Amino acid sequence: MTPPGRLYLPLLLGLLLAPPPPGAQGLPGAEFPPSAARNAQQRLQKHFGHSTLKPAAHLVGDPSAQDSLRWRANTDRAFLRHGFSLSNNSLLVPSSGLYFVYSQVVFSGEGCSPKAVPTPLYLAHEVQLFSSQYSFHVPLLSAQKSVCPGPQGPWVRSVYQGAVFLLTQGDQLSTHTDGIAHLLLSPSSVFFGAFAL
């Protein structure tokens, strides 16, 4: 999403550089050659015309899936736009280019085991790339957390990851999560997506 400040500056420049209507008086000393005004308008049209058509996807975790993290679109503010598709729980990249890829999961639990030597609980979340260039899933983003031994009462741990990658048309983005039983599945806490830059 474009920050609001980035929208106002090009709009203001376009208004300032636009030629005045016939017969209108401009500010003294603020005349620009007609070619400069035309170039500014063309740049604005190019910027705003293409920015709305960039591929974007935002998926949320499916709370009905108990034994795996399944992604869903077209619900709870989730969407697939301008070429992205979801197939076999993977995002299919519609065109080659730079993409910001991101994901978040939130884990929760009632507490650690009260045993003298509690069993460690490891939580992990990874975004993977499957491409025609590789014969296996390549980790793009990876994070781990260890909870036990630790809190005696309820606990919550969140993992957010995001970075820019050069992706190729047809690449598949998927996730792998350890600690599925501890996922706190809600649209605002468990999500996965990508958008073209």
Swiss-Prot record:
Keywords: Cytokine, Disulfide bond, Glycoprotein, Membrane, Secreted, Signal. SUPFAM superfamilies: TNF-like (SSF49842). One of its GO terms (cellular component) is extracellular space. It is found in: Secreted; Membrane. GO terms for biological process: defense response to Gram-positive bacterium; humoral immune response; lymph node development; positive regulation of canonical NF-kappaB signal transduction; positive regulation of chronic inflammatory response to antigenic stimulus; positive regulation of extrinsic apoptotic signaling pathway; positive regulation of humoral immune response mediated by circulating immunoglobulin; positive regulation of type II interferon production. Residues 55-197 form the THD domain. Its main location: secreted. Glycans are attached at N88. InterPro entries: TNF, TNF_beta, TNF_CS, TNF_dom, Tumour_necrosis_fac-like_dom. PROSITE patterns: THD_1, THD_2. Disulfide bonds join C112-C148. It comes from the Eukaryota. One of its GO terms (molecular function) is cytokine activity. Residues 1-26 form the signal peptide. Homotrimer, and heterotrimer of either two LTB and one LTA subunits or (less prevalent) two LTA and one LTB subunits. Interacts with TNFRSF14. Cytokine that in its homotrimeric form binds to TNFRSF1A/TNFR1, TNFRSF1B/TNFBR and TNFRSF14/HVEM. In its heterotrimeric form with LTB binds to TNFRSF3/LTBR. Lymphotoxin is produced by lymphocytes and is cytotoxic for a wide range of tumor cells in vitro and in vivo. Belongs to the tumor necrosis factor family. This is Lymphotoxin-alpha. It comes from Oryctolagus cuniculus. The lineage of its organism: Eukaryota, Metazoa, Chordata, Craniata, Vertebrata.
